[in-house]
Amino acid sequence: MGAIGAAGCEGLRERQIGSLLVSHEDSSRDDLPSKSEFLVKRIRRHRSKGSQSYYSKFVRNYLLGIRKTATKLASACNPRAEAWVVIQDSWYKDLQIRTDVLLEELFGEAGWSVRRKWSFKVPSSLSELAATTHGWRDKSPLEEHVLRFERT
């Protein structure tokens, strides 16, 4: 798949759809890499209702799950194995979340290196459907990313 190119990435992006599972485990003692931890702290300190009690915990568990996945993949793969990830930037209220940067850090910690990254402007986002978001930010400047990691 190393020679997939931008056109091949379009097909990969079109076939991807994800869902989130919410864990109720207490993950407050688990360390995250610096950029992930910084995001969780920003969400926890946000003035919006539920930021401290729910959303910061949800995001922490989500990021820990990504790290766990990257670590398990690394342990199951030989050096030079590839992992391809399609992910879209996101928002928490008025905070833009650069998911590509977070994934690079989480996968890097688990023994993966980014070999190539394609970024695509996203003309709209599902988060724009919520009427309450319009007061928080302008039209979505989000990007979707295809990251090709290699096991080091």
Language-model segments: residues:
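S-adenosyl-L-methionine-dependent nucleic acid methyltransferase catalytic domains
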Residues: M1-T152
